[in-house]
Amino acid sequence: MKRTLLCLLSASLLMASCLPSLVTAPTVVPLNVTQVVPATQTSTQPNAPTPTPVPNVLVPNFQHIVIVIFENKEFGSVIGSPKMPYFNILASSYTLLTEHYATTHPSLPNYISLIGGDTFDIKSDCEDCYVNATSLPDLIEQSGRTWKTYQENMPEACHLGSTLRYVQKHNPFIYFDPIRLNAERCAQSIVPLTQLNVDIASKSLPNFIFITPDICHSAHDCGLDQADAWLKIMMNTLVVAFGATNEPYLIILTWDEGQGDHSCCGLPKSAGGRVATVLISPQVKTGFQDDTPYSHYSILKTIAEAWGLPYLGHAADAETTLIIAPWK
């Protein structure tokens, strides 16, 4: 058995060496699908503050909720693609939302809508179109929980502007005045992806985690195969970290927008297209496909429901569907 684990570990480290700009995963056994839900373990030191549990019968009260977001691919370009075998293994092994629709085009207003409940009339990938409004992080902090966004290849915490592989338009948090204009808050919560391993090692992972790959690993500028290889390493890192504490978690894999303009759920008739969204958790149904129509606002609404937070913007709309069917 030890020889088998060492062989698997060597394979994982070899993959990591081929992707030098990725966050370096801790020394762990490489993830296969059966490891995504770790065996029951005990812990005496939680990763994040444990708020008072919120009684809820609709959505589980997860200790950690993670969003990992990729770029610009329609559902049919991802599901069934031989270039994304790992993503498709996860999609077939856990819960796949088959009718999830992005908010609009281009990228930025989709990101903004995921945490703000609105596009705030942003119609471009502007870098100076800041918003003075309440966002999901405000509500998370008010509930006694913590949050961070980990941005791959961001030069330093709270960085303004874009670089070669980090682009500001894929970081919605920096656009909200209450975050950006509070220097201490911004520096603590908008951080490079390299900070993830530091937080894992110190057992200080926040309750809400938003991970943006760089412009290559998100499949924006590079191929789906590179995004898939990056995802495999990232999933290994996250799941082993959560498994070490046995804290309930939900990982949401999604895409900012598709390549079409399909719509649902009260969105404009011409919206952001159909995207592939996968829910991964010990508390989701396995091998399940949910054909309920959802939008990005549904993700925001579901996070709010899980943690007893107020609904922001269009998350409160009756047409915005709450994600219920996938939970065990």
Predicted regions and their residues:
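Positively charged n-region of N-terminal signal peptides that target proteins for export
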Residues: 1-4
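N-terminal pro-sequences and low-complexity stem/linker regions of secreted or lumenal proteins
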Residues: 19-328
